[in-house]
Amino acid sequence: MAGNIFGQMFRIATWGESHGRAVGVVVDGLPAGLPFSEADIQKELDRRRPGQSEVSTPRSEADRVEILSGIFEGMSTGTPISMLVWNSDARSSSYDVIKNTPRPGHADFSYMARYGIRDHRGGGRSSARETIGRVAGGALAKLLLSRYGVRIAGHVLELGGIRAKPLSFEEILENVEKTPVRCADLEAAEKMLEKVATLRQEGDSVGGIVELIVKGVPAGLGEPVFDRLDADLSKALMSIPAVKGFEIGAGFEAARMRGSEMNDPFRMEQGEITCSKNNAGGILGGISTGLDIICRAAVKPTPSIGKVQQTVDLTTRENTEISIRGRHDPTIPPRMVPVAEAMVALVLSDHMLRSGFINPRTLLE
């Protein structure tokens, strides 16, 4: 299976399966001289960890990270950094009943069609548990970006048709962790919680939209034409399990606008070139403009639901029915926020190294 490595100069390779012994990541390309510790990684993993609230799976995992290489006396050495998290609460027997019946909305059938074999225990490699490696690698990318004034804020913009009101970057940072749904509009968050609770009782699930806002990205970041910054952000977010759509700036609303409405007029402000609005989402021609990068990912409802669904028996080749039991998230967006932030951080770190905005030698000065 190829496709487990992401990035060019700042690269990650994730490994492991949902019910295997462990999951992890190898980070390659982090410059020498960046101070970090397991606590820096753990802080991000704790945000993604299951079993923390009524909107996440009851699977109980400590998700304690172990750093195996690439660090000496609390500082990166420039060599590959390997990180590991042990799986401790996998209940593989719960999946025996679906061994021969692909779950609607899951990758069971497509993995079998592609490889002729699949790990049916929790989805194996296609499980969202793979994203632990992304979050661990993204934690290092965030630390690197913070040295250059780049900050990322992710939040649940919409859940089950309930949309948050517009909030400032600082308001999002202040409020996003105050509620299990990670919606910075606390009034909308209460309605979202009620929606999730109702659907969970019905044996159903709900999707939503995760929004990412990035401040401090310099103008001139990106590599046209096939390595456009927005194209790489799209790939990064679309690679997350359950993401079915991506937009940046005005996004799909741009298709309904006139040019006079869509265009962002340039102007001088305190001696700097800026724009009076930001429909482009901080990127023009695949290159950053210096304005905030604003993008969103559409997340489908959790496919594992208690309702009876149609499927087929792979052994008998006959139609049958399936009802998913076990421990599953009733909604994905809240736990996806730190994953999405990590992927954005990985893209930006990679591009800043490629474009020369980060000089690997200066970290040691």
From Swiss-Prot:
Its EC number is 4.2.3.5. Pathway: Metabolic intermediate biosynthesis; chorismate biosynthesis; chorismate from D-erythrose 4-phosphate and phosphoenolpyruvate: step 7/7. FMN binds at R125, S126, S127, G285, K300, P301, T302, P303, S304, R327. It is an enzyme of class 4 (lyase). The keyword Transmembrane does not apply. Reduced FMN (FMNH(2)). SUPFAM superfamilies: Chorismate synthase, AroC. The keyword Nucleotide-binding does not apply. One of its GO terms (cellular component) is cytosol. It catalyses: 5-O-(1-carboxyvinyl)-3-phosphoshikimate = chorismate + phosphate. Keywords: Amino-acid biosynthesis, Aromatic amino acid biosynthesis, FAD, Flavoprotein, FMN, Lyase, NADP. GO terms for molecular function: chorismate synthase activity; FMN binding. Residues 41-62 are annotated as: Disordered. Gene3D superfamilies: Chorismate synthase AroC. CDD domains: Chorismate_synthase. Its cofactor is FMNH2. It comes from the Archaea. InterPro entries: Chorismate_synth, Chorismate_synth_AroC_sf, Chorismate_synthase_CS. Residues 41-51 have a biased composition (Basic and acidic residues). Belongs to the chorismate synthase family. This reaction introduces a second double bond into the aromatic ring system. This is Chorismate synthase.
